[in-house]
Amino acid sequence: MTTKYVYWGEAKVKLTWKCEQQLPPRERITSVHGFCFKADKLLLVNVTPRGWDFPGGHIEHEETPEECLKREAYEEGYVTGSCSLLGYIIVDHNENPNWDERSPYPKLGYQVFYRMDIDQLHDFKAKHESLERILVNPSVVTKYHHKWNELYQEILDYALVLK
């Protein structure tokens, strides 16, 4: 497990990666993300306004986390594939004096991560948030991703082991 403190605006938030094969409580999952691979290449999508990123986003009301990733991977990268759960980042606002009970996010929430093995690269249409997609060698992801950090690196390293 790796822990990192970050500032989201003025808010100090504790993030902890947990490699886990069971999902956290559904009502506390705020987003789902995926490291998506075609052969040995990692999919990155250029998402407005974030820049280069891995596919992911907020979970919708009736979705399972895996369904969320599959939807986001298709909307952002026009890919489909099979998924394996990697674990989750615990998003802890307990040390955040700006957190408020009316927040749309729980005081203790989760960002779930999957590995997707891409079965099909569909025609890229750029109809959603993404401007483009690329497949890169995972060793160069830091040259593209807008906010790469040690948590993402630990998750990627684990995803690469699951080949």
Language model region names:
Residues V112-R115, F124-I155:
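NUDIX/MutT-family hydrolases
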Residues F37-E75, V79:
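Conserved Nudix-box catalytic region and its N-terminal flanking loop in Nudix hydrolases
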Residues Q153-K163:
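Charge-rich, low-complexity intrinsically disordered segments
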Residues G81, V91-H122:
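Active-site-adjacent beta-strand/loop module that shapes the phosphate/pyrophosphate-binding cleft
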